[in-house]
Amino acid sequence: MHLPEDLVLEILSKVPAVSLARFRSTCRRWNALVVDGSFAKKHYAYGPRQYPIVIMLIEFRVYLVSIDLHGINNNNGAPSAKLTGQFSLKDPLSNSSEEVDIRNAFHCDGLLLCCTKDRRLVVWNPCSGETKWIQPRNSYKESDLYALGYDNRSSSYKILRMHPVGNPFHIESEVYDFASHSWRSVGVTTDFHIQTNESYGMNVKGTTYWFALSKDWWSSDDRRFLLSFDFSRERFQCLPLPADVKNLHLTVVLSVTREEQQLCMFATLGAGNVYKLDVFVATKTEETTGELTWTKFRRFHSKICINVSADHEKKVLVPHHILLPYYNILHIVGEDIYIRQVNKDGDIGCPILLTYVPSLVQIQQGI
């Protein structure tokens, strides 16, 4: 049965973006519609509300993770989590169907900025399959730090690349602008070092945040602070941590709430195998200064140290972006501690978890 194209468009526009990603491989006609710019706009306007999902980077591949929280909500037991699918990124340099080895990934508005194992850089929409390979001015380095953000003034996506030179406090930064399709330098900084073991960068409404260490960390009472980069102004800013987050906190992690996209901070403090987890939410951002107003949301007591993201409505914490060497354990925290293993055969290496909002947003490709 051959349906009229306008009816097919109407039906597909109401299908969740992550489901459309699966349909693309089953029908060439549907695939052509999904990658069309006019359909992307229609889906954004009339499609179902997109909620964040959890994706996991295991053995250089991106997997979808399904988290069942019914056990918490109904008091029927522990929640569960399992791998339910995979986003595949084909290597354009391969003559076969070989996939790209993804070493790290960063999320913004449904797009993933991926660093490959062989030091290439690609922006990828897993739902539409669209990609854009970003060429360097010289070459990419393994020590490079990246962030993907959006310039609200020019309505264009941008990539920030930070390259430490000589020592971790001497950082050369440059921005790739999707509007001009070129790199340009944004200067050199010598005042801070981004702590990559704690912070991979969290993008909230056009600004990316990290935890950073001041240059005089050995003599300063405020040696750790929040570093932000505004993609519209293309500038860094140093922001203070909440008053309750002292330097003696063992680990500080950033995340973002589901509904209102508010920045969250998780600070752990512990001795032995018992930890306290303090959750802070940025309730206000000063437009002129960029400073944040923090509210302490809750404190949890745990026997493990974890990185999580918040679901305020269900009072549940779900992991956001966490490095777990040698383990594939997914932690879900509610009123108590629950642990369930994500089943996958073989050696998983070092998995990375992050929340992802499915979208059909298009990538500016250039001429």
Curated annotation (Swiss-Prot):
List, for all copies, the residue spans of the domain called F-box. Answer: 1-43
What Gene3D superfamilies would the database entry show?
1.20.1280.50
In terms of domain of life, where is this protein from?
Answer: Eukaryota
Show the InterPro entries listed in the entry: F-box-assoc_dom_typ1 (IPR006527), F-box-assoc_interact_dom (IPR017451), F-box-like_dom_sf (IPR036047), F-box_dom (IPR001810), SCF_F-box_component (IPR050796)
**Name of protein:** Putative F-box protein At3g21120
Identify the species of origin.
Answer: Arabidopsis thaliana
Q: What is the lineage of its organism?
A: Eukaryota, Viridiplantae, Streptophyta, Embryophyta, Tracheophyta
